[in-house]
């Protein structure tokens, strides 16, 4: 168990625990080499892994973090370094005062369409650059979107759930991602793709507008996955001018979903009109 003033990898001095959850503990830390404040996330490994599996998950997490470190975008949390401490991977990232979008929704319930599209367009812009670099997020959801003090939204944790072996057991095998926000093809056991990231972003925007994800919050994971796999959900009632675009993002067929570049304030479309390609 880490504590304030611990030195990680001979370089990062822990100062304050700023968050914790299923995907690890996040510390405010001081980089003693570059003299700057950073965020250090200590990642957990999935329970029940054998030593060999734990080592593989550790290696995957380190690899995913190194890949993400190549991504530079104003709406993506920058990764500075990846180190190992007490057998667990630690990701050193940009530090900024923020809360997760999940916390925002917990506090305010829902967003107005103009607020939701601001969040969506910023995250989509970061995803577009990531996808151009061959990086799939695999777990877009409110908990992985940070909202800074100035209202800017940033996406974080690219590929981490996949790397750590954070999976859900289904009749077709193991799936990566958060069941309430994954795409139908992933719920059926398919691989996550750029198009499935678009669906997950659509699910996130739906939740910001309607107060819950498209397929609800069914506590039975298998039942929820069956709902997601069907692709059938209640039409949004509060999406206003983004209703049509949101419907396309949540298309069951990945080929019918728009690219990330269509998810922007300048590309909003009205119901009944097709967006430009």
Task: Annotate each predicted stretch with a short phrase.
Residues 14-22, 26:
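Protein kinase glycine-rich loop
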Residues 44-70:
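AlphaC helix of the eukaryotic protein kinase fold
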Residues 82:
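Activation-segment/catalytic-loop signature of the eukaryotic protein kinase fold
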Residues 86-100, 104:
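Conserved short submotifs of the Hanks-type protein kinase catalytic core
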Residues 119-120:
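Activation segment signature within eukaryotic-like protein kinase domains
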Residues 197:
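Conserved catalytic-loop aspartate of Hanks-type protein kinases
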Residues 123-135:
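Protein kinase catalytic-loop region centered on the HRD/HxD motif
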């Amino acid at each position: 168990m880490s504590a304030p003033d611990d030195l990680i990898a001979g370089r990062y001095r822990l100062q304050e625990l700023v968050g914790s959850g299923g995907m690890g503990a996040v510390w405010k830390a001081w980089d003693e080499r570059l003299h700057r404040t950073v965020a250090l996330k200590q990642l957990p490994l999935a329970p029940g892994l054998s030593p060999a599996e734990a080592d593989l998950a550790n290696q995957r997490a380190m690899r995913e973090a190194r890949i993400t470190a190549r991504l530079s975008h104003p709406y993506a949390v920058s990764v500075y370094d990846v180190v190992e401490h007490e057998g667990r991977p630690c990701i050193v990232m940009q530090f900024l005062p923020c809360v997760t979008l999940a916390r925002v929704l917990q506090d305010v319930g829902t967003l107005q369409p103009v607020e939701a599209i601001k969040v969506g367009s910023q995250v989509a812009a970061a995803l577009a650059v990531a996808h151009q670099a061959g990086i799939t997020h695999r777990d877009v959801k409110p908990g992985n979107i940070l909202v800074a003090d100035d209202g800017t939204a940033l996406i974080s944790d690219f590929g981490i759930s996949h790397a750590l072996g954070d999976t859900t057991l289904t009749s077709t095998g193991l799936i990566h991602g958060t069941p309430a926000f994954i795409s139908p093809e992933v719920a059926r056991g398919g691989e996550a793709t750029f198009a499935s990231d678009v669906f997950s972003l659509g699910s996130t925007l739906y939740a910001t507008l309607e107060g819950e994800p498209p397929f609800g919050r069914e506590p039975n994971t298998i039942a929820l996955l069956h709902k997601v796999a069907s692709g059938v959900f209640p039409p949004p009632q509060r999406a206003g001018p983004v209703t049509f675009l949101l419907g396309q993002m949540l298309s069951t067929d990945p080929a019918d979903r728009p690219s990330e570049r269509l998810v922007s304030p300048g590309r909003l479309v009205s119901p009944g009109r097709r967006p430009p390609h």
